Amino acid sequence: MESESGKSPNFRIKLPMVRKLSAFFIFLLCDLLLLSLSAGAAEPNPNDPALRPPKGSQLALVVFEDLQCPQCRLSAPVIKQAGQTYKIPVIRHDFPLPMHNWSYQAAVIAHYFDAQSKQLGIEYRDYIFEHQPEIYPAILRSVSEKFASDHKLALPFVVDPQGKFAAEVNAERDLGNRVGINHTPTIYVVSSKPGGKPVLEVSDKTQLFQSIDAMK
């Protein structure tokens, strides 16, 4: 990915074409696997507190995502735009999948940035999605350091010395398991409108705006 100046970011390391193609086919295989899993997904429990809008809102988006998931990367801008257009909260949960080799650590780093400020955590996740095709385990830290530097921060040598952020990621993953998440992204439109449908899962990102309209 080129920067606005036309030069590649400092952290980018050119990979052999074979490695890039291998990564592409792995992503494709994961997507096909997750698609088959989602076909048998259980209906969400509308009484689960995780599937309710925050206090003061009648409508919200609840998203379970994996930072290494290609479909999550493609859905993220649409979700962001929907939140801004409808002026509704977007509640993001990290749900790193076991077949991905750097998403868990990226989620831990994301929670480190959350601790600095929630907005910084949001921006880090968006940054990782933007550069996702270039990332592999050996350069995840340098990518994260570049983000920190751009925001006038220094990423600690040990990001999570006490395991606090890993525990937060584990808690979000446990929450997803409780809800019944088995694929990413899983996107819910949730509503507290009296007499209305409380939860609607959106499986096609192109139908997100239409789904929000239906829940209003």
Where are these regions (language model features)?
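Amphipathic alpha-helical interaction segments
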Residues: 32-35, 132-135, 196
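Extracytoplasmic thiol/disulfide redox context detector
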Residues: 11-12, 24-102, 163-183, 211-216
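A short, structure-level motif marking secondary-structure boundaries and short turns
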Residues: 63-65, 95, 128-130, 156-159, ...
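Structural alpha/beta surface segment adjacent to cysteine/selenocysteine redox centers
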Residues: 67, 73-147
